[in-house]
Amino acid sequence: MSITKDQILEALAEMSVMEVVELIEAMEEKFGVSAAAAVVSGGADAGAAEEQTEFDVILTSHGDNKVATIKALRAATGLGLKEAKGMAESAPVAVKEAITKEEAEALKTDLEAAGAAVEIK
């Protein structure tokens, strides 16, 4: 005879908190898993609670004014003319990666002022 999910839930509802903790520990030992890992990856709310700290600035298009975009890229990255032109022409491309939110917003503003289309990821 097998136990149904409802029977398991009913048995859990009747347990004290300490008994549930002991049950979880026993299940972790038996199956070689950790309940903490399941909790972290379990819900969409868990990911929303953690704020992203590193951002990538992606140039999606150089826009109508390619020259202004190249100048803005050179100023932001320190690249030479040839490298900045290559970056502008190979969009979509990451301009800077793993930077702070403030840096990403400032870079996006500068590039958009030059006419480029930019995303922050």
Swiss-Prot record:
Protein name: Large ribosomal subunit protein bL12
Family to which the UniProt record says this protein belongs: Belongs to the bacterial ribosomal protein bL12 family.
Gene behind the chain: rplL
GO cellular component, one term: cytosolic large ribosomal subunit
SUPFAM superfamilies named in the record: ClpS-like (SSF54736), Ribosomal protein L7/12, oligomerisation (N-terminal) domain (SSF48300)
NCBIfam families: L12 (TIGR00855)
Record organism: Shewanella piezotolerans (strain WP3 / JCM 13877)
One of the GO biological process terms: translation
Keywords in alphabetical order: Ribonucleoprotein, Ribosomal protein
InterPro entries: Ribosomal_bL12 (IPR000206), Ribosomal_bL12_C (IPR013823), Ribosomal_bL12_C/ClpS-like (IPR014719), Ribosomal_bL12_oligo (IPR008932), Ribosomal_bL12_oligo_N_sf (IPR036235)
Quaternary structure (record): Homodimer. Part of the ribosomal stalk of the 50S ribosomal subunit. Forms a multimeric L10(L12)X complex, where L10 forms an elongated spine to which 2 to 4 L12 dimers bind in a sequential fashion. Binds GTP-bound translation factors.
Pfam families assigned to the protein according to its UniProt record, in alphabetical order: Ribosomal_L12, Ribosomal_L12_N
Function according to Swiss-Prot or TrEMBL: Forms part of the ribosomal stalk which helps the ribosome interact with GTP-bound translation factors. Is thus essential for accurate translation.
MF annotations from Gene Ontology: mRNA binding; structural constituent of ribosome
